[in-house]
UniProtKB/Swiss-Prot annotation:
GO biological process: amino acid biosynthetic process; aromatic amino acid family biosynthetic process; chorismate biosynthetic process
Similarity comment text for this entry: Belongs to the EPSP synthase family.
InterPro entries for this protein: Enolpyruvate_Tfrase_dom (IPR001986), Enolpyruvate_Tfrase_sf (IPR036968), EPSP_synthase (IPR006264), EPSP_synthase_CS (IPR023193), RNA3'P_cycl/enolpyr_Trfase_a/b (IPR013792)
Localization of this protein: Cytoplasm
The EC number(s) this enzyme carries: 2.5.1.19
Pathway note: Metabolic intermediate biosynthesis; chorismate biosynthesis; chorismate from D-erythrose 4-phosphate and phosphoenolpyruvate: step 6/7
Domain of life: Bacteria
Identification of the protein by name: 3-phosphoshikimate 1-carboxyvinyltransferase
Amino acid sequence: MKRMKLRTNAGPLQGTIQVPGDKSISHRAVILGAVAKGETRVKGLLKGEDVLSTIQAFRNLGVRIEEKDDQLVIEGQGFQGLNAPCQTLNMGNSGTSMRLIAGLLAGQPFSVKMIGDESLSKRPMDRIVYPLKQMGVEISGETDRQFPPLQLQGNRNLQPITYTLPISSAQVKSAILLAALQAKGTTQVVEKEITRNHTEEMIQQFGGRLIVDGKRITLVGPQQLTAQEITVPGDISSAAFWLVAGLIIPGSELLLKNVGVNPTRTGILEVVEKMGAQIVYEDMNKKEQVTSIRVVYSNMKGTIISGGLIPRLIDELPIIALLATQAQGTTCIKDAQELRVKETDRIQVVTDILNSMGANIKATADGMIIKGPTVLYGANTSTYGDHRIGMMTAIAALLVKQGQVHLDKEEAIMTSYPTFFKDLERLCHD
C-alpha cells in the first residue's frame, strides 16, 4: 500500500495564506441559487469535492450551472423549476449535500434515491427522516438509524411543523427550513444550542423571510426566492489548521487573509485566545463578517471546552486536540458526542492517531482529556477517509523530530481543501 510521506521537523512557518472558500456557505449558495428565480452568481466558491457533489446533484435535477470568469453562474427557475432526475443522486462524502438537498426535495412532486460513499453510508439520517416524515414526506434509509441510501418521495402539500431539535445540528435545522419554504403555514424550529446560522442568513439574503428569536426560528411558507450575487469568504474551518500550526511551531508568523468570522463559527478564536494565543485581527469588516488574522507562536495553556461553545467549533475540535497536546496542563473537551458521527468517529480516531505519535489523550463518551505538552514521534497513520483528520495529521507531523509520518488515503483532503499540501510547502521556509 502506497502511503504519503508527510513533511516532518519543520522550521518556523512564515507567509500569507488565502484559505479556500467557506464550505458551508458554498453549499448553501448553490442550493438556494438553484431554486431562486433568475441568475445567481457566486464568487470565491470552494471547489472541493463536497461542493462539486452538490453542484452535480442540481445539474441532475435539471438546473443549468456553469463557470464563467471564475464565477459560478446558476440559472434558477424557482422551486417549480426542478425536474425528476433520470438517475440516482450521488452525494459522495458530503453529509451536508444529502441532508440539505433531502430537505429541499421534500416539497417536490417526484421521487429520488440518494446515495453516498462508504463513509457517508455510515452516517445516520434518522435526524432528518423523522421531521421530514412529520411534514408529509415519504422518506426512508437502512435500519432504524436510517443510513443511506435514502429513498424520498416528495409532497407538494407539505405540512408545517414545530420541531425541537434533539441534537445540536445546523444540517437538520437547515433541512427543515428548506422544506418549510415550500410548506403552507408556520414552521418553527427550536434549537438545543445555537448552531451555525448560514442557512437563515442566506435565505434572507435571497429575499426570504424568517424570524430568529434566540434558539427559536419561525418561517411562514410558501415563499419564493430571488437570485443574488454572492461572495464566499474564506473558510474558518480550513484557516484553523494554519492558525494552530502558527501557534505551536516555534518562530512562526502567519497572515490568514479574508477569513469568514460569522459569530456562530468563531468558537475556535475564543478558545485559542483563552489558551494564550497571540493573534491580531486586521482589516476587520464587521458587516461582511470577514477579517485577516495574524498569528505568531505562543505559549499555550490547557482549558475546558464544553456546552454552547461546542456547536461553534465542532469541525475544529480535531486540530484543537492537537493544539492541546502542545499546551501546558490539561485540556478537557466535553459535550461533543456529535464528533462520533462525523466522517469518522473523530473522538476515537483523533485519540488513536495522536496517541500513536506519543500524545497523552483519553477518549471519553462525549470528548477527550488531553495532557500536555508532549513530544510527538513518527507513526504510520491514515485519514480513514476524513479530510479534517488528514490535515490535523499533516500539521502534527511538522512537530516530529524523530521518525517519519506516513499517511494513507490522503486524497480525502480534496473534500474541503484541494490546495492544502501546496500551501503547506509554501509556508515551510527551510
